[in-house]
Protein backbone atom coordinates (compact mmCIF):
# COMPACT_ATOMS: atom_id res chain seq x y z
CA UNK A 1 0.00 0.00 0.00
CA UNK A 2 1.02 3.65 -0.22
CA UNK A 3 0.48 6.81 1.79
CA UNK A 4 -1.17 9.79 0.21
CA UNK A 5 1.25 11.53 -2.14
CA UNK A 6 3.99 13.75 -0.82
CA UNK A 7 4.97 15.03 -4.24
CA UNK A 8 3.95 14.72 -7.85
CA UNK A 9 6.60 15.29 -10.48
CA UNK A 10 5.33 17.79 -13.03
CA UNK A 11 6.42 17.82 -16.66
CA UNK A 12 8.27 20.78 -18.16
CA UNK A 13 9.00 22.08 -21.63
CA UNK A 14 12.64 23.22 -21.83
CA UNK A 15 13.65 25.54 -24.65
CA UNK A 16 16.08 28.34 -25.40
CA UNK A 17 15.35 31.48 -23.37
CA UNK A 18 13.26 33.98 -25.30
CA UNK A 19 11.45 31.24 -27.16
CA UNK A 20 7.70 31.69 -26.94
CA UNK A 21 6.73 28.03 -26.68
CA UNK A 22 3.98 26.65 -24.49
CA UNK A 23 3.35 23.01 -23.51
CA UNK A 24 0.21 22.84 -25.65
CA UNK A 25 -0.34 20.98 -28.90
CA UNK A 26 -1.53 24.06 -30.80
CA UNK A 27 1.55 26.05 -29.72
CA UNK A 28 3.92 23.22 -30.66
CA UNK A 29 2.44 22.38 -34.07
CA UNK A 30 5.25 22.05 -36.61
CA UNK A 31 7.91 21.91 -33.88
CA UNK A 32 10.36 19.12 -33.05
CA UNK A 33 10.07 18.14 -29.38
CA UNK A 34 12.60 15.78 -27.82
CA UNK A 35 11.63 13.18 -25.23
CA UNK A 36 13.39 10.27 -23.57
CA UNK A 37 11.91 7.05 -24.92
CA UNK A 38 9.64 5.14 -22.53
CA UNK A 39 9.14 7.97 -20.03
CA UNK A 40 5.98 9.67 -18.83
CA UNK A 41 6.93 12.62 -21.06
CA UNK A 42 7.13 10.29 -24.07
CA UNK A 43 3.73 8.76 -23.25
CA UNK A 44 2.21 12.23 -22.80
CA UNK A 45 3.65 13.65 -26.04
CA UNK A 46 2.66 10.54 -27.98
CA UNK A 47 -0.90 10.63 -26.69
CA UNK A 48 -1.66 14.35 -26.80
CA UNK A 49 0.70 15.94 -29.32
CA UNK A 50 1.93 13.50 -31.98
CA UNK A 51 -1.35 13.46 -33.92
CA UNK A 52 -1.70 17.25 -33.64
CA UNK A 53 1.24 18.10 -35.89
CA UNK A 54 3.99 17.99 -33.26
CA UNK A 55 7.03 15.94 -34.26
CA UNK A 56 8.01 13.87 -31.23
CA UNK A 57 11.70 12.95 -31.43
CA UNK A 58 12.64 10.05 -29.15
CA UNK A 59 16.02 9.52 -27.52
CA UNK A 60 17.46 6.57 -25.62
CA UNK A 61 18.89 8.99 -23.02
CA UNK A 62 17.83 12.49 -22.00
CA UNK A 63 21.41 13.72 -22.41
CA UNK A 64 21.11 13.05 -26.16
CA UNK A 65 18.05 15.31 -26.30
CA UNK A 66 19.99 18.06 -24.51
CA UNK A 67 22.77 17.86 -27.11
CA UNK A 68 20.26 18.22 -29.94
CA UNK A 69 18.52 21.05 -28.08
CA UNK A 70 21.82 22.93 -27.71
CA UNK A 71 22.61 22.34 -31.39
CA UNK A 72 19.17 23.52 -32.52
CA UNK A 73 18.14 20.18 -34.01
CA UNK A 74 15.03 20.13 -31.80
CA UNK A 75 12.97 23.11 -30.66
CA UNK A 76 12.43 21.95 -27.08
CA UNK A 77 12.66 18.98 -24.77
CA UNK A 78 9.67 17.68 -22.77
CA UNK A 79 10.65 15.98 -19.52
CA UNK A 80 10.30 15.59 -15.79
CA UNK A 81 10.70 19.07 -14.24
CA UNK A 82 12.85 17.77 -11.39
CA UNK A 83 15.22 16.22 -13.91
CA UNK A 84 15.37 19.43 -15.95
CA UNK A 85 15.87 21.73 -12.97
CA UNK A 86 18.33 19.56 -11.07
CA UNK A 87 20.15 18.48 -14.21
CA UNK A 88 20.54 20.36 -17.49
CA UNK A 89 19.29 23.77 -16.35
CA UNK A 90 21.76 23.84 -13.46
CA UNK A 91 24.78 23.20 -15.72
CA UNK A 92 26.82 25.66 -17.81
CA UNK A 93 25.31 24.09 -20.96
CA UNK A 94 21.80 24.91 -19.71
CA UNK A 95 22.38 28.59 -18.93
CA UNK A 96 20.65 29.78 -22.14
CA UNK A 97 17.60 27.55 -21.59
CA UNK A 98 14.55 27.64 -19.31
CA UNK A 99 11.27 25.91 -18.53
CA UNK A 100 8.57 27.42 -20.73
CA UNK A 101 4.88 27.99 -20.10
CA UNK A 102 4.56 26.57 -16.61
CA UNK A 103 4.71 23.07 -15.26
CA UNK A 104 2.13 20.43 -16.08
CA UNK A 105 0.76 18.18 -13.34
CA UNK A 106 -2.17 17.21 -15.56
CA UNK A 107 -4.75 19.79 -16.62
CA UNK A 108 -7.59 17.29 -16.94
CA UNK A 109 -8.43 13.68 -16.12
CA UNK A 110 -6.89 12.31 -19.34
CA UNK A 111 -3.58 14.08 -18.74
CA UNK A 112 -3.56 13.09 -15.06
CA UNK A 113 -4.10 9.46 -16.08
CA UNK A 114 -0.87 9.61 -18.10
CA UNK A 115 1.20 11.69 -15.65
CA UNK A 116 0.07 9.81 -12.56
CA UNK A 117 -1.15 10.69 -9.11
CA UNK A 118 2.20 11.31 -7.46
CA UNK A 119 4.62 9.57 -5.14
CA UNK A 120 3.62 8.10 -1.79
CA UNK A 121 5.49 6.24 0.91
CA UNK A 122 5.42 2.44 0.51
CA UNK A 123 3.79 0.66 3.44
CA UNK A 124 3.03 -2.99 4.07
CA UNK A 125 -0.70 -3.61 3.50
CA UNK A 126 -1.19 -4.84 7.06
CA UNK A 127 0.22 -1.56 8.52
CA UNK A 128 -3.06 0.34 8.31
CA UNK A 129 -2.35 2.36 11.48
CA UNK A 130 0.99 3.50 10.09
CA UNK A 131 -0.66 4.52 6.83
CA UNK A 132 -3.26 6.55 8.73
CA UNK A 133 -0.54 8.29 10.78
CA UNK A 134 1.53 9.11 7.70
CA UNK A 135 -1.52 10.41 5.83
CA UNK A 136 -2.45 12.55 8.84
CA UNK A 137 1.09 13.91 9.18
CA UNK A 138 1.25 14.77 5.48
CA UNK A 139 -2.11 16.55 5.70
CA UNK A 140 -0.97 18.49 8.77
CA UNK A 141 2.26 19.77 7.25
CA UNK A 142 0.39 20.78 4.10
CA UNK A 143 -2.23 22.63 6.17
CA UNK A 144 0.18 24.40 8.54
CA UNK A 145 2.59 25.58 5.82
CA UNK A 146 5.57 23.45 6.85
CA UNK A 147 5.44 21.49 3.58
CA UNK A 148 5.78 24.67 1.50
CA UNK A 149 8.49 25.99 3.82
CA UNK A 150 10.57 22.86 3.22
CA UNK A 151 9.72 22.71 -0.49
CA UNK A 152 10.88 26.31 -1.05
CA UNK A 153 14.34 25.42 0.27
CA UNK A 154 14.83 23.01 -2.62
CA UNK A 155 12.39 23.89 -5.41
CA UNK A 156 11.25 27.22 -6.84
CA UNK A 157 8.04 25.65 -8.13
CA UNK A 158 5.11 23.51 -7.00
CA UNK A 159 6.01 19.83 -6.69
CA UNK A 160 2.68 18.81 -5.18
CA UNK A 161 0.06 19.63 -7.81
CA UNK A 162 -3.66 19.35 -7.17
Residue ranges: model-predicted function:
Residues 1-162:
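Proline/Glycine/Serine-rich low-complexity intrinsically disordered segments
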